[in-house]
Amino acid sequence: GIRDLRCLVGSEMCIRDRFLIVSDTHGRMYNLEEAMEREEFDGMIHCGDVEGMDDLIKSKVNGPCYMVMGNNDWFSNLPAEIQVNIDDYRAFITHGHNYGVSLGLEGIYAEALSRGVDIVLFGHTHRPVAEKRGNLWIVNPGSLTYPRQMGRKPSYAMLTINEEHELSVEIKYLD
């Protein structure tokens, strides 16, 4: 919805929407809570492998909280995948394991193209990715609990939409 624009001090840019994007927390809250304290955000997207913490996480988010089921969420009532609108952008949220993301991005890329979305958000690999192919953003925030990329720092992503409705994504790391 429409909300007051928050302008960054000393900057021309005004922020419309900021989403904290996380995945693969695997039942652990400590790094997620640190990321939530560190960032200002209007909503959260969790790309799966929540492992029973969905109600607790939702209770800590003051705004929309979109979550999907991962391959380790056996007894979850979360949806396997969802499509939502974030400002003017169509987002497809999935854990990614059903699209072969461990082998590469081609499967998830093809699915996102077939759905006509602007951004696809997924997890599963525990390795962060934020790349734009044409008009499509492909985003994996990595894992806050069990990072697997070089250096193995816990990671998440921030999705920002400015007052010109421009979308940007940044991968961030906890030390």
PLM features: residue spans?
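N-terminal active-site segment of His-dependent metallophosphoesterases
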Residues: 11, 16-64, 73-80, 152-155, ...
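Active-site environment of divalent metal-dependent phosphoester hydrolases
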Residues: 26-30, 50-55, 72-77, 99-104, ...
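Binuclear metal-dependent phosphoesterase catalytic core
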Residues: 31, 86-87, 110-117, 139-175
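Short acidic, glycine/proline-enriched helix-loop-strand junctions
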Residues: 58-66, 131-145, 150
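Single conserved hydrophobic/aromatic residue that forms the stacking wall/gate
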Residues: 1-15
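Helix-adjacent hinge/juxtasegments
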Residues: 66-111, 115
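Active-site neighborhood of phospho(di)ester-bond hydrolases with catalytic His/Asp-centered motifs
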Residues: 21-23, 43-49, 66-71, 93-95, ...
